[in-house]
Amino acid sequence: MAAKDVVFGDSARTKMVEGVNILANAVKTTLGPKGRNVVIERSFGGPIITKDGVSVAKEIELKDKLQNMGAQMVKEVASKTADIAGDGTTTATVLAQSIVREGMKYVVSGYNPLDLKRGIDKAVTAAIEELAKISKPCTTTKEIAQVGSISANSDQSIGQRIAEAMEKVGKEGVITVEDGKSLEDELEVVEGMQFDRGYLSPYFINQPEKQVAVLESPYVLLFDKKIANIRDLLPVLEQVAKSGRPLLIIAEDVEGEALATLVVNNIRGIIKTCAVKAPGFGDRRKAMLEDIAILTGGIVIAEEIGLTLEKTTLEHLGQAKRLEVGKENTIIIDGAGDAKAIEARVKNIRVQVEEATSDYDKEKLQERVAKLAGGVAVIRVGAATEVEMKEKKARVDDALHATRAAVEEGIIPGGGVALIRAMQGIKGLKGDNADQDAGISIVLRAMQEPLRTIVSNAGEDAGVVVNAVQASKGNNGYNAATGEYGDLVAQGVIDPTKVTKAALVNAASVAGLLLTTDCAISEAPKDESAGGGMPDMGGMGGMGGMM
């Protein structure tokens, strides 16, 4: 086992805070409409140019072990916020840095770190409640476009494309992002369905960079029981292999010998296959299998209708133009089912929605309607170069996540103003002791920081603007893009409530952990000095007598 360096108290915390500052200072240059780009070197190919906070954070590894620990903890803030809300990574990083920086001043002055953390947690809980009060639903296409535009670094065209896509496939519909083949962004809507089941083995993956299995023009076998014996499958596999097309198997489960054989055939290239579990449970699973059958023009192989796997022919299988199978989701694009049959199925489910008594049943039935009727929207991102394409695609992904978050939990005024307004509701908050009060004041100071950073990146005086915004009310704030004060919601400067809440919660969580850390253990640097080698032989002077 390698030797370890153990560092205690302020010595450990100071180094870790240095790491926090290095990462946060790199990330926060990207915040706001006038934030700057960051250029990232790659070990191969050209550099990446990005204004996406989480992309910058992910690239940072520091040489000093303790500094790197601090940086990695804040990187976790950015990643977690991106996972939950899809955006707000830079805001989360800025908040975390501020809480750590202010908190360290109190810790060094002798305040109890655990009480500071309790005070921080109290303030954050109260701030989240205030944000929920400020929030309003995001319903119009215009608002969705505004959220998308801001998340895509004020790119109006991206926001507009996402709003159009949501309008066409519905808010529950599936939207995917692909590389375009022209300079312009394109939107295409194709009939399709997504369900929450992924591949049963990672060996089915044929696009490692995306971690998905993509099948072009596949057959779809639908079976309502488990498949364990490969002999049952052989007749249909032989027919599909002769056709030269791939096969997706959707069954209650595929296991043992059957799964192993499918994987081996897939790896050897004998027949391209993928297997997934059927979505849903019990009666709902049967209904969803039937939905997929109607969408793909196939039949669910079931004993009730006198069909077994051995008797299955190609006529019983569904077909689709394309299938994408990920770790947790499967998307069926352009199924070969009859349009009238799909329409009749949708009408049938809508009748069931009307008759359903429980909210849960209604919700699940509405999900099925959305899956059958909504389709899949594909946004093709256009750009002049590959570097620009990657950067733009990352922004479209961010914008897509942000708009979904906005539809889910509503919107609040952007530009850091919502946090300033939420401060008003927690100014009277008191802790159980003076140390907890200090924790509350740390959060109050941190909640100003996103606005300060946005203003600083725009080249203005942060102190003056913060005072002006605090003196105003409601949605009024500072628009860094225009340099003017006004109603930010009316001007389209809005943020998803979910994003700001996630940023604040994650920042406080990790910053609190860092403040309560009193010992850091890292691997000791290896001794690079030369090895023992042979002793000095004193030169060759004693060998003269051999001549």
Swiss-Prot record:
Coiled coil: none annotated. GO terms for molecular function: ATP binding; ATP-dependent protein folding chaperone; isomerase activity; unfolded protein binding. It is an enzyme of class 5 (isomerase). Gene3D superfamilies: GroEL (3.50.7.10), GroEL-like equatorial domain (1.10.560.10), TCP-1-like chaperonin intermediate domain (3.30.260.10). It catalyses: ATP + H2O + a folded polypeptide = ADP + phosphate + an unfolded polypeptide. GO terms for biological process: protein refolding. GO terms for cellular component: cytoplasm. It comes from the Bacteria. Belongs to the chaperonin (HSP60) family. Forms a cylinder of 14 subunits composed of two heptameric rings stacked back-to-back. Interacts with the co-chaperonin GroES. This is Chaperonin GroEL. The gene is groEL.
